[in-house]
C-alpha cells in the first residue's frame, strides 16, 4: 500500500491536470462542461440545476404566473449561486440549447433593464 505522502502527491498532480484541462475548455463549444468545472459542481449539482429549470419550464407550459426572483432563490438556496453566477448558468444552458424557453423568459423578465450578458437571450438572438 502506498504511503500517505505518495497518495497526496498523486492527488495534487491530478488536481493540477484537471485545472489545466478545465482552462482548455471552450465555454462556447462546451458550455455545460465549462460551467460544471467553473462552479466545481458534482453530477448531483448539475441534476439539481436541471430540476430547477424543469420546475420553471413546467410553470411556463402551465401558463402559471412566475416570480423570477423564485428562480434566483432556488439557485441560491440549493446551489449557493448568486445573481451574478445565475447569469453564467442561464448563458451556459441557453448556449447548450437546454431550457431555452426558461432562459429567454428569465432574461426577458428584466425588460429594458436586462443585463448586458443576458440582453441577446432576452432579444431571442443567442443560442
Language-model region placement:
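Long, leucine- and charge-enriched amphipathic alpha-helices
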Residues: 1-35
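Short, charge-rich amphipathic segments
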Residues: 3-8, 37-44, 117-126
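Short, well-structured alpha-helical interface segments that form or flank functional binding sites
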Residues: 6-9, 13-16, 44, 48-51, ...
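Intrinsic-disorder-associated interaction segments
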Residues: 7-10, 14, 42, 64, ...
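Amphipathic alpha-helical interaction modules
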Residues: 25-80
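Amphipathic alpha-helical binding modules
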Residues: 76-127
Amino acid at each position: 500500500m502506498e504511503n500517505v505522502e505518495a497518495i497526496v502527491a498523486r492527488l495534487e498532480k491530478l488536481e493540477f491536470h484537471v485545472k489545466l484541462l478545465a482552462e482548455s475548455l471552450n465555454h462556447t463549444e462546451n458550455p455545460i462542461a465549462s460551467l460544471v468545472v467553473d462552479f466545481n459542481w458534482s453530477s448531483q449539482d448539475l441534476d439539481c440545476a436541471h430540476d430547477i429549470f424543469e420546475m420553471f419550464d413546467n410553470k411556463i407550459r402551465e401558463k402559471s404566473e412566475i416570480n423570477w426572483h423564485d428562480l434566483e432563490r432556488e439557485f441560491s438556496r440549493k446551489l449557493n449561486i448568486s445573481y451574478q453566477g445565475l447569469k453564467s448558468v442561464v448563458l451556459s444552458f441557453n448556449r447548450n440549447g437546454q431550457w431555452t424557453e426558461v432562459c429567454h423568459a428569465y432574461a426577458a423578465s428584466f425588460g429594458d433593464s436586462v443585463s448586458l450578458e443576458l440582453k441577446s437571450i432576452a432579444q431571442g438572438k443567442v443560442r
